[in-house]
Amino acid sequence: MKIDKRKNYYIILDTETTASCTPEENIERKIMEKLVYDLGYTIATKSEIVIKRNYLVKEIYENNDLMNNAYFNSKKPMYDEMVENNQVEVKPFAEIVKIMQNDIAETGVKFFGAYNVGFDLDALMQTSNFIYPNIFKMFFKKTKSGKFAPDTIKFCQAYLFRKELEIIDLWTMACQTLCSQKTFQAFYLQETARGNIKSNAEIVYNYIEDLEGNFAEDHTALSDSIIETRILQRILRIRKTLETKFAFLPYRLIERVV
């Protein structure tokens, strides 16, 4: 692998998670529990993917009680078959993090991104504290309401990335670019019950690949991170100054043009 230091490198990560309670109970919690069992990421430039990694987190994946609570627990036999066929490795979380840190250092990654990046940052922090309780010093930030909440960005930068990467949310970026294009709204427009334009990764990927709605996400970490990388690469080709790269409820940034 040859690294061109003149280029920007991005790590695009996706997680599949479970919890210590059922999905129905978890969604009622003030803060949803997110324990990572499937972690996948790419490292890419604006034109190519140079690294693909996929691991199952040993401490979570091999805990049957936790896996029974996974939203996509019906996929457990599929994962078991992937492990048996050497398509994915089961590793301790600390080892996965070390591999990721080495990849970040060796490629000179500057940006960390995901589609709804806040979810994945929180999942990484929660998983760290679940597997290794009372080890990490927590960071807190003041919210707009004046209360304090865990600072997932500082946590991940300090302990998991070992580098102050710029955080980018592909959902936020897609809403200001691809989802605000006339062709997207003319041919791929779908709305929620509240009348908001749908802007999930599946719809956006169908649009950029002209798949007419025939593509459905696998909801496995590496597969999803690859399509999210393709979305990022398309966004990077658009010459537009973005208002922000990480916003709360980013669908509100979509400009209706049709």
Residue ranges and their predicted role:
Residues 2-125:
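Conserved non-catalytic scaffold segment of RNase H-like nuclease domains
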Residues 119-165:
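Substrate-recognition/cap helix-loop segment adjacent to the acidic, metal-dependent catalytic center
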Residues 15-19, 172, 227:
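Short, glycine/acidic-enriched loop or turn micro-motifs at the edges of active sites
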Residues 128-132, 178, 233-240:
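Hydrophobic/aromatic-lined pockets within catalytic cores
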Residues 61-62, 66-83, 158, 163-223:
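Active-site-proximal helix-loop-helix substrate-binding element of RNase H-like nuclease domains
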Residues 110-117, 122-123, 183-258:
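Acidic, Mg2+-coordinating catalytic module of metal-dependent nucleases/exonucleases
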Residues 20-22, 175, 230:
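Conserved protein kinase catalytic core
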